[in-house]
Amino acid sequence: MIDLRKVRNFYIACGYIDLRLGIDGLAAVVKQQYGSHFDEESLFLFCGRRTDRIKALYWCGDGYILLYKRLSNGRFQWPRSEAELRLLDPQSFRWLMEGLRIEQKTAIRKGKPRDLF
């Protein structure tokens, strides 16, 4: 089974992908289009034109695991600008899964130190 705590590299395939592709098709896209290789620390994420569903491909050591998530309400904030493979940190992955953008502005503005009394 997949343990997301062991995943160190979250790769997001920016742009559109045909979500009718299964394990073999998505693995071929990763290897041929992006020139990347699978390991047990990497999870590859894909999104189609409808941004309410994504697929994730993970190599668990003895085979592939294909994960599929469809939102019942809302859409993923998926980057569409480039057809590239982008590496996300775990925080950006959590933001994406929670429906937020992966590039967040600063949530709390920096302040200046001041006297409290």
Protein language model features and the residues they cover:
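Polybasic/polar functional segments that serve as interface/processing modules
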Residues: 1-117
